[in-house]
Amino acid sequence: MTQLFDTLGFIDTSAARTGAAAATHDAAATSTEPAGPAGAAAVSLEQVGKVFATPRGQAAALRDVTLDVRRGEVFGIIGRSGAGKSTLLRLVNGLERPSSGRVRVQGVDVGALDEDGLVALRRRTGMVFQHFNLLSAKTVFENVALPLKIAGVPKAERVRKVEALLELVGLAAKRDAYPASLSGGQKQRVGIARALVHDPEVLLCDEATSALDPETTQSILALLADINRRLGLTIVLITHEMEVIRAVCDTVAVIEQGEVVETGPVWRVFGDPRHGATRALLSTLVHDLPAELAARVQPLPEQAALPDGAQVVLDVRYTGESGGEPDVGALAAALGGSVRFLHGGIERIQGHAQGRLVIAAALRAEDAGQSTARGGAVAALLERARRHANHAEVLGYV
């Protein structure tokens, strides 16, 4: 529990300080730590590495990580279990020191801070956990008010602040309820309110929705997006779920075996993933062909012509790079008009239309008898499709 309170910035781990002396010291500590130049990144990692000692020797958890999180954005960090996501977050709030490189939060070098400086940092850096870590013997109000009480904030100010936060997270009616009577989503809302009590500049979320059902997850993500808009708060969100990234993040970084292998705007990474780890994480969102349809798709014959009445199956993808709406009508016209849509759809991510269409198109009458060897009519069909999409490939024929 001491580590939890330390993470939240509830306590000072240096010599005991109480009353007015503590308040004066905290104010001085805050005033001597610059917030960084205007326009600087809220969180910056420069060639950061982290090595842990194990019984088998040195183990690298992070390797040469360089990231910039812009002020006011929601930045998602995604990776599989053991990729190094949580280690990265612990470096940002000073629970771990980097083995190499530099971590800055609001322009302050986290690795250079002493214990007093770390306490001040954690009060400016809110933390939302996967597990709610609420005190069962205290009410919702008391759980949220606790860090303010420990920090010596006067009672009247505590009441004002906590009531405003409970209103913000939609729990005003649960003010006097105990954690045992709350749903998982309500408990996480308490955790979010508690993380905001010190008016943080950055909010760190460590798998904040992974213990929740899908409907509750969406409500918590909507709350985080609302807080980001209302308060202009920078949010760094750790997750292993691409659905979470798509729903709320502006920018995403993909971590694989301790290295950042891909980063960029969410729409770009989703529409045109460039690393195998990213494609693997996105596979849960990319729907494969239904089994009955996949069974019907036959490979193109290498030498012979297609059977009479056969149609070429094309996998057409839109990445959103053009910024406009996919002109599906123009695609159909370019393919000769005899087109069937077999599978897929278009969605919008950050205002960019992207998606996948699996279509069946007939060869032109004059080309229908040509051999498929060395391209020929099928290659011409594919080329026409590529003029109206970002990517297109032949899957076979039906």
Swiss-Prot record:
EC assignment: 7.4.2.11
PROSITE patterns, per database record: ABC_TRANSPORTER_1, ABC_TRANSPORTER_2, METN
Enzyme class: translocase
SUPFAM superfamilies cross-referenced by the UniProt entry: ACT-like, P-loop containing nucleoside triphosphate hydrolases
InterPro entries, A to Z: AAA+_ATPase (IPR003593), ABC_transporter-like_ATP-bd (IPR003439), ABC_transporter-like_CS (IPR017871), ACT-like_dom_sf (IPR045865), MetN_ABC (IPR041701), MetN_ABC_transporter-like (IPR050086), NIL_domain (IPR018449), P-loop_NTPase (IPR027417)
Main location (coarse class): membrane
Gene Ontology MF terms: ABC-type D-methionine transporter activity; ATP binding; ATP hydrolysis activity
The name this protein goes by in its record: Methionine import ATP-binding protein MetN 2
Residues annotated as binding ATP: 79-86
Family the entry assigns: Belongs to the ABC transporter superfamily. Methionine importer (TC 3.A.1.24) family.
Organism expressing this protein natively: Burkholderia lata (strain ATCC 17760 / DSM 23089 / LMG 22485 / NCIMB 9086 / R18194 / 383)
One GO term describing the cellular component: plasma membrane
Complex and partners: The complex is composed of two ATP-binding proteins (MetN), two transmembrane proteins (MetI) and a solute-binding protein (MetQ).
Catalysis: reaction(s): L-methionine(out) + ATP + H2O = L-methionine(in) + ADP + phosphate + H(+); D-methionine(out) + ATP + H2O = D-methionine(in) + ADP + phosphate + H(+)
Keyword Acyltransferase included in the entry's annotation: no
Coiled coil region boundaries: none
Role: Part of the ABC transporter complex MetNIQ involved in methionine import. Responsible for energy coupling to the transport system.
Subcellular location per the Swiss-Prot or TrEMBL entry: Cell inner membrane
Gene that produces this protein: metN2
Alphabetic keyword roster: Amino-acid transport, ATP-binding, Cell inner membrane, Cell membrane, Membrane, Nucleotide-binding, Translocase, Transport
Membrane-topology annotation of the record: Peripheral membrane protein
Pfam families: ABC_tran, NIL
Domain ABC transporter: 43-282
